[in-house]
Amino acid sequence: MRKAPLLRFTLASLALACSQALAGPSPYSTLIVFGDSLADAGQFPDLVGGTPGARFTNRDADGNFAPVSPMILGGRLGVAPGDLNPSTSVGIQPDGNNWAVGGYTTQQILDSITTTSETVIPPGNPNAGLVLRERPGYLANGLRADPNALYYLTGGGNDFLQGLVNSPADAVAAGARLAASAQALQQGGARYIMVWLLPDLGQTPNFSGTPQQNPLSLLSAAFNQSLISQLGQIDAQIIPLNIPLLLSEALASPSQFGLASDQNLVGTCYSGDSCVENPVYGINGTTPDPTKLLFNDSVHPTIAGQQLIADYAYSILAAPWELTLLPEMAHASLRAHQDELRNQWQTPWQAVGQWQAFVASGAQDLDFDGQHSAASGDGRGYNLTVGGSYRLNDAWRLGLAGGANRQKLEAGEQDSDYKLNSYMASAFAQYRQDRWWADAALTAGHLDYSDLKRTFALGVNDRSEKGDTDGEAWAMSGRLGYNLAADTSNWQLAPFISADYARVKVDGYDEKSGRSTALGFDDQERTSRRLGVGLLGSVQVLPSTRLFAEVAQEHEFEDDEQDVTMHLTSLPANDFTLTGYTPHSDLTRASLGVSHELVAGVHLRGNYNWRKSDELTQQGISVGVSVDF
């Protein structure tokens, strides 16, 4: 009767180990945790089950405790397993970076950072107040925080449970004390600090259905209002987690999160410890299964809740790894448009005083390999280009071109889907005199990000947040070359130098759902400045057919790591900036083409274009036809 539920829980408990093996990008050196029992990784000895350290979550069939959310999150970020150990445990060695201790109040959390960390038995338990182990606090004795680490902070519940919060003023003061811990970390050098909002204590088995439910819900809200206000004044990247809203969504639609939809999820629990054990999914129920329940005991979540919170935190951290690829999509569209112009420039010039019209269509493939702060992605694109040119004299040809490009990018672990429609217009000029030649183009474009769907794991299912936005693109490009062979030769070989400038702006936007996971993003700008050298060659293989080839090496001067400023749409006043994609400084590009004169003045051409940097590959094919008149 227990086999299937226990199997499900065993698989859930393996999430930590599996996530470490499959860890995605992470710009953080490690994860450092401060807080209370909601994040305690095993500070206290396990006096019942004999495991190295007790955690305030449910046990599996073998008696092992489920991981807490920072352990799961750290695994997904690729943090070393030893770093996820508790800091001051009696039984788990060596010491890790998780300083959270069950029973800690907001003052004790602050003390564990600035003065002394103690594993002390909390009030209400046998031997309350007994210190099992202590060590200097994280920043004690003048130590500094790791600026490249991610800090994880939760707390406040024990101020209520231990009778320290009895009024709105008490709740405001407790919220300010938790914010003081974030302030202390920032003053010590921390840059990235993730902070829980306090769950609604009225919506826990300990207080649900009691006269204290509504007052505690109001006091929890007062705590959070104070906390958010204080966090907004700290000069660091404070990443809030709207845990109350997340849990309310789980309670409103439990089946979407794999929870039982026919059970009282806030009035019952799994273990029966200081709460009513669920008769169906409780540990002694007819079908024991902690993944179907939100609470393990009177106030602590099961593995289902811990996984949900870890996924929520990861979805926020991972968002810029995908969203900073939006400007790169636009740059890819610009490059495809410029490639089409260069392809067209290889066709024979029309006679002086004549026009030449052309139309071309192509397809592109775009691949981003993962970086330490950017997701991998696979893109597909299609374009249509039309234009014309007029030959002024023997040396000059001027023209205009317009293009439409549709691009789709799948990025990240859950295949988020981003679509871009871009519309480009260019004016260009070509020059050739004796053996010298040159070309230049000015391009402007409108960007229509019509369907942006960010998808991520959230519990047992995926969730998507959607939005749309616009943008603009500007570019200038030029080449100067010298033909080594005379114009009358059947072959041409021309070394050249090139210069390119491009600027893309993606307007900020908010995802539309209004849920806990919905994010808002500020404007993004990405500029590219490149210089290059290359060789352009051609050979006349038949009287009406010519083959072309080009290879170039370019250096990108704008290769700084990109970032994006963002906020939870449910907490719009608290924004933060996180890092994302990093352009590479060296780029190789090459092209092959053939032009064939069908009849006098009508040319058919085909081209293949390829670009490669360390983690970016773009390639495309196109077919075009031009007509002189």
Swiss-Prot record:
<dbReference type="InterPro" id="IPR005546">
    <property type="entry name" value="Autotransporte_beta"/>
</dbReference>
<dbReference type="InterPro" id="IPR001087">
    <property type="entry name" value="GDSL"/>
</dbReference>
<feature type="active site">
    <location>
        <position position="300"/>
    </location>
</feature>
<dbReference type="InterPro" id="IPR036709">
    <property type="entry name" value="Autotransporte_beta_dom_sf"/>
</dbReference>
<dbReference type="Pfam" id="PF03797">
    <property type="entry name" value="Autotransporter"/>
</dbReference>
<dbReference type="GO" id="GO:0106435">
    <property type="term" value="F:carboxylesterase activity"/>
</dbReference>
<dbReference type="InterPro" id="IPR008265">
    <property type="entry name" value="Lipase_GDSL_AS"/>
</dbReference>
<dbReference type="InterPro" id="IPR050592">
    <property type="entry name" value="GDSL_lipolytic_enzyme"/>
</dbReference>
<keyword id="KW-0812">Transmembrane</keyword>
<feature type="topological domain" description="Periplasmic">
    <location>
        <begin position="542"/>
        <end position="544"/>
    </location>
</feature>
<dbReference type="GO" id="GO:0006629">
    <property type="term" value="P:lipid metabolic process"/>
</dbReference>
<feature type="transmembrane region" description="Beta stranded">
    <location>
        <begin position="620"/>
        <end position="629"/>
    </location>
</feature>
<dbReference type="InterPro" id="IPR036514">
    <property type="entry name" value="SGNH_hydro_sf"/>
</dbReference>
<dbReference type="InterPro" id="IPR048099">
    <property type="entry name" value="Esterase_EstP/EstA"/>
</dbReference>
<comment type="similarity">
    <text>Belongs to the 'GDSL' lipolytic enzyme family.</text>
</comment>
<feature type="topological domain" description="Periplasmic">
    <location>
        <begin position="485"/>
        <end position="490"/>
    </location>
</feature>
<feature type="topological domain" description="Periplasmic">
    <location>
        <begin position="393"/>
        <end position="394"/>
    </location>
</feature>
<feature type="topological domain" description="Extracellular">
    <location>
        <begin position="612"/>
        <end position="619"/>
    </location>
</feature>
<feature type="domain" description="Autotransporter">
    <location>
        <begin position="350"/>
        <end position="629"/>
    </location>
</feature>
<feature type="topological domain" description="Periplasmic">
    <location>
        <begin position="599"/>
        <end position="601"/>
    </location>
</feature>
<keyword id="KW-0998">Cell outer membrane</keyword>
<keyword id="KW-0719">Serine esterase</keyword>
<feature type="signal peptide">
    <location>
        <begin position="1"/>
        <end position="23"/>
    </location>
</feature>
<comment type="function">
    <text>Esterase that catalyzes the hydrolysis of p-nitrophenyl esters of acyl chain lengths C4-C10 and Tween detergents. Also has a pronounced thioesterase activity towards palmitoyl-coenzyme A.</text>
</comment>
<dbReference type="InterPro" id="IPR006315">
    <property type="entry name" value="OM_autotransptr_brl_dom"/>
</dbReference>
<feature type="transmembrane region" description="Beta stranded">
    <location>
        <begin position="602"/>
        <end position="611"/>
    </location>
</feature>
<feature type="transmembrane region" description="Beta stranded">
    <location>
        <begin position="382"/>
        <end position="392"/>
    </location>
</feature>
<feature type="transmembrane region" description="Beta stranded">
    <location>
        <begin position="531"/>
        <end position="541"/>
    </location>
</feature>
<feature type="topological domain" description="Extracellular">
    <location>
        <begin position="555"/>
        <end position="588"/>
    </location>
</feature>
<keyword id="KW-0472">Membrane</keyword>
<keyword id="KW-0732">Signal</keyword>
<keyword id="KW-1134">Transmembrane beta strand</keyword>
<feature type="transmembrane region" description="Beta stranded">
    <location>
        <begin position="473"/>
        <end position="484"/>
    </location>
</feature>
<feature type="transmembrane region" description="Beta stranded">
    <location>
        <begin position="545"/>
        <end position="554"/>
    </location>
</feature>
<feature type="active site">
    <location>
        <position position="297"/>
    </location>
</feature>
<feature type="transmembrane region" description="Beta stranded">
    <location>
        <begin position="491"/>
        <end position="501"/>
    </location>
</feature>
<dbReference type="InterPro" id="IPR017186">
    <property type="entry name" value="Lipase_autotranspt_EstA"/>
</dbReference>
<feature type="topological domain" description="Extracellular">
    <location>
        <begin position="24"/>
        <end position="381"/>
    </location>
</feature>
<protein>
    <recommendedName>
        <fullName>Esterase EstP</fullName>
        <ecNumber>3.1.1.1</ecNumber>
        <ecNumber>3.1.2.2</ecNumber>
    </recommendedName>
</protein>
<feature type="transmembrane region" description="Beta stranded">
    <location>
        <begin position="589"/>
        <end position="598"/>
    </location>
</feature>
<dbReference type="GO" id="GO:0016298">
    <property type="term" value="F:lipase activity"/>
</dbReference>
<dbReference type="GO" id="GO:0009279">
    <property type="term" value="C:cell outer membrane"/>
</dbReference>
